[in-house]
């Protein structure tokens, strides 16, 4: 399992355990699974998907380290 935390300027959007996270990277969509290599990347407009949930975003950043995934995003309203 992954520990996922998604924050926006307004609030904490989600925190909890998930199987995987799909994100809209600036070089294309990609998926984070358990034991993924450490990573820092920018995100572009699109949809973050995790455990059947979808969160539309305008952009942001992702950090992956030791099965902990942190996203700092600007929400699309």
What are these regions (language model features)?
Residues 2-77:
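Compact, glycine-rich, soluble single-domain proteins
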């Amino acid at each position: 399992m992954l520990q996922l935390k998604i924050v926006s300027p307004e609030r904490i959007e989600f925190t909890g355990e998930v199987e995987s996270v799909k994100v809209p990277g600036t070089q294309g969509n990609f998926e984070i699974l358990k034991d993924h290599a450490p990573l820092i990347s920018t995100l572009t407009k699109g949809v973050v998907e995790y455990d059947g949930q979808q969160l539309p975003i305008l952009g942001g950043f992702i950090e992956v380290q030791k099965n902990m995934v942190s996203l700092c995003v600007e929400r699309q309203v």
